[in-house]
Amino acid sequence: MAYENLLVEKRDGIAFVTFNRPKVLNALNRKTVGELREALLDARDDSAVRVLILTGGGEKSFVAGADIGELAQQTPVNGKEFSLFGQSVFHLLETIGKPSICAINGFCLGGGCELALSCTIRIASKTAKLGQPEVKLGIIPGYGGSQRLARLCGKGVAHELCLTGEMITAEEAQRIGLVNRIYEPAELLPAAEAMAKKIIANAPLAVKYTMEAIERGTQMPLEEGLFLEATLFGLSCATDDMREGTKAFLEKRAAAFKGK
């Protein structure tokens, strides 16, 4: 599929999704979010894709928030629909069953930060700036920021970032657990690709079940989450990959996983 606002490349088991509106700092409009939905569905249905890497085109920005011109046209009715549509796409990213690595290469604000929060893992360049500045525009986060940020970093952090609207540095984002690692700008994408390859080397079903245990389990009471983990552990024990993995370990060789 041809995209107007995205660049999508698939190689070596990785789908690279680059937001490509550098003149507006890769701001999200409805068309871009719709194209992201199509790219995610394509990656989900492509068995050759094991990991997604999301980043921004240009040197200044990952995604600098919503397209303000489009945002200014929202009414109470279509504003709610606008929010629900974006939430559905970001939820798809979160539940696609394949890990996503967000390589934050600059401004990561508003909808961009909400997009990053929907990814499995977040890494950033030293030049990155993150934040939820919606209150400065008279609105609140609409693509899940108030919920995912509070769940990831705690209510205190979410309140501070969402109520002040201030940007934070990559170092501060790492300190509060919003990003995992920080790299020099030139090292960011190679680091994301190296991480993706480490994931790809592992058993596909085990990766999928692990993500499910973490994503679903942390939304449950502990006892229910532990039961889910035990259920998924049992399912993993029924796979050919489990037999191959244990056999390869005992034979001191690399495992050849097939996702079965």
Go through the PLM ranges and name each one.
Residues 89-95, 103, 109-163, 176, ...:
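CoA-thioester-processing core
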Residues 41, 56-92, 108, 221:
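Glycine- (often His-adjacent) and acidic-residue-rich active-site loop
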Residues 22, 123-128, 179-227, 234-235, ...:
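C-terminal long alpha-helix characteristic of the crotonase
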Residues 166-172:
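Acidic, divalent-metal-coordinating active-site segment for phosphoryl/phosphodiester hydrolysis
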